[in-house]
Amino acid sequence: MQHLKDFSANASTRYSGLTDNMIEGKGYARGFELDLSFQQRNLHLRFNYTLSESKRKFKEINNGQAFNPPYDVKHNIVINSSLYFSSRFSLNLLWTFSSGVYTTFPVGVALAHNITDSENKPILIPVYTDRYNYKLPDNHRLDANLDYLFPYKRIRLKISAGAYNVYNHSNPSFVYFNPEENENGKTKFIPKSKVILPFIPYISLHLNW
């Protein structure tokens, strides 16, 4: 792929528009997908696997070395199963897995010159070198639900009960950095993560007529 766009390492929107900070590079994307399904009486199974790789290369970024962009997900797996105990009662399971994406971590910290915060404390600034230099942990979770159907004449009532992220795996939705001072008085930027979707049970009613 040619003529790919990205922001330069020294991009600034203070004195110029966004398009003035764009640089041009090249890259490639390739992948493979496998999709399998199985059905036998009351059991339905589906398996999907995607293997992909994406690289980008810009003369002005990472000293011209190729890098993985933040949307590069190497492995992606989806396993879906449905078990029908009867025409009214069923169990559904969905397990998903995706490789961690790349993000940019600081390599150090600098002290802002003659600038303090509201409490007159010095302001610390993270120092970055290479872009997309850290791979986040892999993401995976299991969702499950039970469905029960109550048909009555023209009315169909379905009750669903289940949970997202059954085993409560901590999948980081985003990462931020918090300055912390150790016993020696040195300050480091410690990476912290936020989890948006922990274990969440639910129950729902669906009425059709």
Predicted regions: what is each one?
Residues 1, 88, 97-122, 137-143, ...:
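C-terminal beta-signal and adjacent terminal beta-strands/loops
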Residues 2-5, 22, 69, 134, ...:
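Flexible, active-site-adjacent loop/turn segments at secondary-structure boundaries
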Residues 3, 12-105:
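Gram-negative outer-membrane beta-barrel transporters
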Residues 5, 26, 40-41, 55-59, ...:
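Context-gated lysine
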Residues 6-20, 57-65, 109-128, 176-190:
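Solvent-exposed loop segments that connect transmembrane elements
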Residues 24-29, 37, 69-74, 132-141, ...:
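Short sequence motifs at beta-strands and strand-loop junctions characteristic
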Residues 33, 79, 133, 148, ...:
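Generic recognition of flexible, low-complexity loop/linker segments
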